Amino acid sequence: MRTVKFKGMGIRHLDDGRFVIVPPTFLWWPAKHVILSIILANAIITTFFLLQASNILASILLCSILLSIVFAMGYIRESFALIYIHFIYCLLYIVFSFLFIPTFYYDQKICTNAAICKTVQEWLEELVTTVASRWIYAFTGTTLITHIMMTPVSLRMMKYSASCEALEKMMTDEEYVKKMKRLAIIHPERYHPASV
């Protein structure tokens, strides 16, 4: 069994001729464990805030927790589709958060159709009646940080799951496997690279 690096991923060439993708890591830990830990931490933070929120906001936060569970199942099953959706979701969350930061900072007035004008902070306090505004900002900042942390890990898992799916399809093609075995016999140095 030998391992080579290809486009940032480790690929193992087993002695029986099969190829397997080495699961990616983030810093020193498996990427799957890292992303699941961050999703869990984000869900715990959201739950803490949900218990103190008003009915409208609590419903939104509950939906986000359920969505986190779906994404976590996607990472556990290494589903490319769910990981891809989560990656896009993280990017959109980051973009919209940075778009709304100036609105929170300048605290401008927002008017409804009934000509009721309130500042952003007043609207937030109406939505979340039992939580001080500083906790709202803390929640927003914390969840923004967790989504920023999830983005690069999600990208690695997305590449890994896509590679695994492609490799699995290739290995189910009997003609392709036979061709690879013949080439491995003719050119052993090419298909049995040195360990790294």
Swiss-Prot record:
Judging by the UniProt lineage, the source's domain of life is: Eukaryota
* Name recorded for this polypeptide: Uncharacterized protein C48B4.8
